[in-house]
Every structure is written in structure tokens, then in C-alpha cells.
């Protein structure tokens, strides 16, 4: 017979263990009646399958000041024999949010699923003009979604959803740069997400892509987004490229659903979401040199990075003084990496348009 590929078995066993449902996963090879039988030996966690998780985010930059967020999530897994899950989340801090989600596979292999979810969010949106923060709006809303989809093994997922939404976009402080909105609408959403990056943040190899399309006859617009990223390593140097398009195949994107530029590795010279607009195209490439590891207790490599970015905005909603600029540019240098608590980085971005930004997360 064929030689046993132990490396493939080890990889699949690690993937099963990585699901988080098992205390241990092992395997053994048995010989019965001139046949070799591979037996997988999973042991379910005795303390599961319920999980309570917490996350803390702290960031600051020279244009927006500091913000923070504390998030808690309760996940109840394996609520039936097909692997149904319930996820409840709540977030407080500079932004507020809460959500409840039910995910139900339709077959033992979990190739097909249905999902229902409801969420509320209240986000502070700073409005910029001439690189100065001139107003702050509150972008809040509630959304209910019913979805059906399919999983492509470890490659990714495709889903089709019907979404009911209500949105409020109201000025909180500052000048009236944008009109207030209060609206309710519904529509279809199709999404394809494929991910083969070897890490969630600061990957060293692989690729990912996301295609997202939302169409609402009620609101009179459609929103399309394409996001592609790839990474590879040359020794201790990691090269990563990313491209994104956000636009409106039908109508014009409303302010509360606009494309966004600004923030770390999304035109780093600008503050987070400093530029709102429609028909936005972005491309960026960065090189990172692994220069060491984080101090004791913090796993992960430490990197010194340099990024070059460019973008074109068809219609500006903020920073309208840039409307005559064909291509926006940004360059950034930073120090950071991935830790058990998430990504951490410190850096500086600059654009020849006059924008600059120190950032820490």
C-alpha cells in the first residue's frame, strides 16, 4: 500500500484540536485482516462547551486623541448534534455595541448552514476638513439578518442574507458638515470570504479575499466592496500587498455607509476614517523586517515595517479640499507585531497632501 503521510495526519489532527471543542486529539494506526485502519481519538473538554471571552482595545493618534473599547462575548457551542452555536456580545467604551447570533449547521460535515442575528451599534464618527477635526457625528443603527450559506472546508465561506436595518446619523458636536439622517431600509447581501493567511494579524505567507455586495431598492443604492491581500517571506523579510475597492454600482453611497480611508495601513498618514467618500480605490505594499521577539511573556515576532500606499476617491464627503487630487499618497514607518493580546504597533505616517499622523495601538 501507499506510505503513511504522517505530516498530513498531524496537520489535520491539529486542525481538529484547533476547533476548541476537545481537551486532546490523538490517533492510532490499527491492522485488522490485512487492512490498515486510522482511528482518530478526540476527547471532549469536560469544562465546555461554553466560553466567556474578553477583549480590550486601546489606541491613540495625534489627530483624534485616545479611544478605548472593552468587549465581552459569551459563546455556547454544540447546542445540538449538528453543532449549533449561540453567540452573545456586548461592547462599551468610545463606541457601544451589542449582538445576539444563532448559527446552525444543516449537515454533520457542516458544509451548509443557516444563521440569524441581531445587533446594535453606536459609533462616534469624527468629521475632518483641512486635516482638522471640525465635528463629531453619532452613527448608530440596528440590523437584523437571516442568512444561508456554505463552508468550503478551511478555505472560506459564502453566504446570502436578507437584512433589515434602521440607521441614525446625527451631529453631536461641531459644525454641520453633513446632513442628519434617520432611515430604515432592507436589502440583499451576498458575501464571499476566502482566507489562507497563516496568521490573523501580521501574516508571513498566504492570501485572503473578500467580495461583498449589498443592494437595497428601499434606500436606492447598492454597495460593492472587494478586498484582496497577499503575503510572502524572503528570509526574515515579509512582503505584503493589499488592494481594496468600495463603491456604488447603483445610486450613491449614503454617508452612514460610505467608503473609508485613514488609520493604520489604510492610508496611515490620515486619522482613522478621516476620509469618507464613494468610489474609493486603494492599494498598498509594505515590507517588514523581523528584528526579534517580544519580551518574556509576549509571544510573537517584533517587526520594523515600511509602507507605501495610494488611493483614488471619486466623490469626497469629507476633506473635500482634496477633490482635485488624482492620487492620494501615504508613507509610514512603524514598529510592531502580533501578541497574545492582539496586534501592537507604534508608528508615523506622512502624505505629501499635508496630512501626518503618529499612532499607537
Where are each of the predicted segments found?
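N-terminal periplasmic "start-of-domain" segments of outer-membrane beta-barrel proteins
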Residues: 1-2
